Amino acid sequence: MGNCLHQAELSPSTENSSQLNLEDLWNFSYDGNDSFPEIDYDASLEAAAPCHSCNLLDDSSLPFFILASVLGILASSTVLFLLFRPLFRWQLCPGWPVLAQLAVGSTLFSIVVPILAPGLGNTRSSAPCSLGYCVWYGSAFAQALLLGCHASLGPKLGAGQVPGLTLGLSVGLWGAAALLTLPITLASDASDGLCTPIYSTELKALQATHTVACFAIFVLLPLGLFGAKGLKKVLGMGPGPWMNILWVWFIFWWPHGVVLGLDFLVRSKLLLLPTCLAQQVLDLLLNLAEALAIVHCVATPLLLALFCHQATRTLVPSLPLPERWSSPVDTLGSKS
């Protein structure tokens, strides 16, 4: 919400216009024995100065964006190659089609990171910015929904007990993610050479919709999965959602959903911050949450690799040799 600037200095005319309280002027009588009340003009000017925040993700952060993009593309491409490699043991991972789509989502996110990076030029149009935010949040929404699906269906994915998962459910999840990106796509533009969301009264409904979508998917979805897991365990109703290393993904986006909601409340004046320091802390948290979300494109392939390694290490030795290469693709194909 602003560059790292010193507080604005007021002009001499502004300094001279600092006046007494109206009540003091009303009660003031011109008498030689009376004296003017003492006023701390420096404190008044300090309070009147605008509040500026230091933006961490400015032009100097361009190497971070580029490095995250390159590493994310390389790592995700490697995971995709191993998942689709013929006769490779990762094809025995439970729900490997969902895992492949997670890698695709991470790759798409990595590709658009440079589009939204600062410091790449000052002649950006609104079209690349809108497309960048669409893919940015669309891939993140899709990954979150796929993780929720993977956790809910659990080991059933590996047994081929859900025939329509590969096509029908995947199309539905990606379609829902695309629809959820419409608000931020329509409410983003290039400003001063930077791709940024537009905050205006006319677009307040779009901003509210986007904030609610982020809060629901990045915050409420993982909390719901944890709650369902604990509730079913307490009531003895079954194992509940399938917990695994992939749930770490939500750590990278959970702060973004929370801080984005707080920022919207402040902009809408539903939540008033008492001091300039509080506003600066909120802006800092917004930058840190965005940086953490960017790091997910590098962490996601590593989480997928670790999950597949753990799953196949315990699964492959227990299968006879001919059954080791009967992947879930064959099982789903035989049922269709």
UniProtKB/Swiss-Prot annotation:
Gene Ontology terms for molecular function: C-C chemokine binding; G protein-coupled receptor activity
UniProt GO BP: chemokine-mediated signaling pathway; inflammatory response; regulation of chemokine production
Cytoplasmic topological domain residue ranges: 85-95, 154-166, 229-244, 309-336
GO CC term, one of those recorded: early endosome
Subcellular location: Early endosome; Recycling endosome; Membrane
Extracellular side: 1-63, 117-129, 188-207, 266-287
Listed Gene3D superfamilies: Rhodopsin 7-helix transmembrane proteins (1.20.1070.10)
Disulfide bond annotation, renumbered to this chain: C51-C276, C129-C195
Glycan-modified residues: N16, N27, N33
InterPro entries: Duffy_chemokine_rcpt
Membrane-spanning parts: 64-84, 96-116, 130-153, 167-187, 208-228, 245-265, 288-308
Membrane topology: Multi-pass membrane protein
Superkingdom in the source lineage: Eukaryota
Record's keyword annotation contains Chaperone: no
Record keywords: Disulfide bond, Endosome, G-protein coupled receptor, Glycoprotein, Membrane, Receptor, Transducer, Transmembrane, Transmembrane helix
UniProt main location, coarse: other
Function, as annotated: Atypical chemokine receptor that controls chemokine levels and localization via high-affinity chemokine binding that is uncoupled from classic ligand-driven signal transduction cascades, resulting instead in chemokine sequestration, degradation, or transcytosis. Also known as interceptor (internalizing receptor) or chemokine-scavenging receptor or chemokine decoy receptor. Has a promiscuous chemokine-binding profile, interacting with inflammatory chemokines of both the CXC and the CC subfamilies but not with homeostatic chemokines.
Similarity comment: Belongs to the G-protein coupled receptor 1 family. Atypical chemokine receptor subfamily.
Protein name: Atypical chemokine receptor 1
The organism of origin for this protein: Saguinus imperator (Emperor tamarin)
